């Protein structure tokens, strides 16, 4: 069975980067994974001044809009680092919040797919043939957490 997720209020909405599960990374608290991810686009770029605005955005939708502005210059290595940045944030989210960690682990070995009708990089896109990098990230994080819990069980 494939598990599709997209909107926060739908089943498995906690898998969305817009879910209200804050994270601490590099001594900074971020309200959502989306806030963190969008801000990281500008680290070291000439438009780095936008980072505090993204951080302070009232909603993940606002953070996304600020980060997606096409007139701003992204960091030079963005295409090389964006999937690792996403993975770091998603892992932190599920290590921080036990309730949603349990939801993720209970998906077993099911295929996780971000059912985005517009994003064929992070999701499956309108034609369902997208790259689904967010789903793949979640499945990788699920496996890493399983391994961590297994090691913890051995040494308790």
From Swiss-Prot:
Reactions performed catalytically: 2,5-diamino-6-hydroxy-4-(5-phosphoribosylamino)-pyrimidine + H2O = 2,5,6-triamino-4-hydroxypyrimidine + D-ribose 5-phosphate; 5-amino-6-(5-phospho-D-ribosylamino)uracil + H2O = 5,6-diaminouracil + D-ribose 5-phosphate
EC number from the UniProt entry: 3.2.2.-
Enzyme class: hydrolase
InterPro entries noted in UniProt: NADAR, YbiA-like_sf
Molecular function per GO: hydrolase activity, hydrolyzing N-glycosyl compounds
Gene3D superfamilies: YbiA-like
CDD domains per record: NADAR
Gene Ontology biological-process annotations: carbohydrate derivative metabolic process
Source species, domain of life: Bacteria
Role summary: Catalyzes the hydrolysis of the N-glycosidic bond in the first two intermediates of riboflavin biosynthesis, which are highly reactive metabolites, yielding relatively innocuous products. Thus, can divert a surplus of harmful intermediates into relatively harmless products and pre-empt the damage these intermediates would otherwise do. May act on other substrates in vivo. Has no activity against GTP, nucleoside monophosphates or ADP-ribose.
Entry protein name: N-glycosidase Npun_R5314
Originating species: Nostoc punctiforme (strain ATCC 29133 / PCC 73102)
């Amino acid at each position: 069975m494939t598990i599709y997720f997209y909107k926060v209020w739908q089943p498995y909405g906690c898998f969305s980067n817009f879910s209200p599960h804050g994270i601490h990374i590099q001594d900074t608290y971020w309200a959502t994974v989306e806030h963190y991810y969008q801000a990281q686009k500008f680290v070291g770029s000439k438009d780095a001044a936008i980072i505090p605005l993204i951080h302070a955005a009232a909603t993940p939708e606002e953070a996304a809009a600020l980060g997606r502005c096409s007139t701003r210059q992204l960091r030079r290595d963005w295409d090389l680092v964006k999937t690792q940045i996403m993975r770091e944030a998603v892992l932190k989210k599920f290590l921080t919040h036990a309730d949603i960690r349990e939801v993720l682990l209970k998906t077993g070995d099911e295929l996780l797919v971000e059912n985005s009708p517009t994003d064929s990089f992070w999701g499956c896109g309108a034609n369902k043939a997208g790259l689904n990098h967010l789903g793949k990230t979640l499945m990788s994080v699920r496996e890493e957490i399983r391994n961590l819990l297994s090691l913890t069980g051995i040494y308790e």
